[in-house]
Amino acid sequence: MTAFQQLPSSVLQTGAIFLSIIIEALPFVLIGSIVSGLIEVYITPDKVYHFLPRNRWGRIFFGTFVGILFPSCECGIVPIINRFLEKKVPSYTAVPFLVTAPVINPIVLFATYSAFGNSFHVALLRALGSILVAVILGIFLGFFWQEPIQKENRLACHEHDFSHLSPAKKVFQVFVQAIDEFFDTGRYLVFGCLFASIIQVYVPTRILTSISATPIFAILLLMLLAFLLSLCSEADAFIGASLLSSFGLAPVLAFLVIGPMLDIKNVLMMKNYLKARFISHFITIVTLVVLVYSLLIGVIL
């Protein structure tokens, strides 16, 4: 009898679920890391600023939807937003990009589609929720917020300029950046997969049923879970899909929408660059909009 055979069946089941989730998620994390490396090396804020529309509404919607063309993982989105703001990209363009870029890009949408059994339904609802939050934040910043959102004496950060490198060195730097992002993201993915597998095996079904019977409590619980786990947007759909049978669509949708825009690591990074007053408004607006959106989806569907 091997050492594995001597383990309790619950431990073996947890391990099997953990491996199945992480094996599904890793290819998308790898692709996302490579794309992020390409953006870091080849796409500069100056290039983005060149394409900005002239009117305020156009800039809000530009920031909301440009993430389709420039997919960015939320793990590195905050420093990118800081660079945009330093290049005089308005906050009502930069912040919507912060919210939607990790969600509406093709990689994350396809990962969500795959995680939920090749269903466009959840991927579409996730994208719509993200767009709704982005537009509301853009309107708030564009028409009601009157001050800069950056810290006046923000912490200095080390920023890379790759423009002077030869083509071969740029390609090398793409892979350097991608490897850094892959391993940085991987640690969060491991904890998320482990947590999801433990819930499925060790938390009694009656407890999950009682939680899911109260929609607002289930939604708030999974929103908190998304905040604490700090998962990468290329991988969180697989965690969400594993929780679907226990909590239902609306709470899982809240988990998927809020995770890329509001988690521990993002808030900590925001504190380096952005004013505390803005961060508190950002957290409040995002939380309320995602909560109301998820409740409405639960009622309608």
Model feature map: region roles:
Residues 2-34, 46, 50, 124-223, ...:
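Selected transmembrane alpha-helices and immediately adjacent juxtamembrane segments
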Residues 24, 28-31, 40, 44, ...:
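Short helix-loop boundary/capping segments at the starts of domains
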Residues 24-25, 63-69, 228:
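Interfacial helix-start motif at the membrane-water boundary
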Residues 31, 62, 66, 75, ...:
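Short glycine-rich loop/turn motifs that provide flexible caps or phosphate-binding loops at active sites
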Residues 35-66, 208-213, 239-240:
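Membrane-embedded helical hairpins/re-entrant loop segments and their flanking transmembrane helices
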Residues 38-43, 202, 264-265:
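Structural signal for the C-terminal ends of transmembrane alpha-helices
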Residues 70-128, 203-274, 278:
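Membrane-interfacial helix-loop connectors
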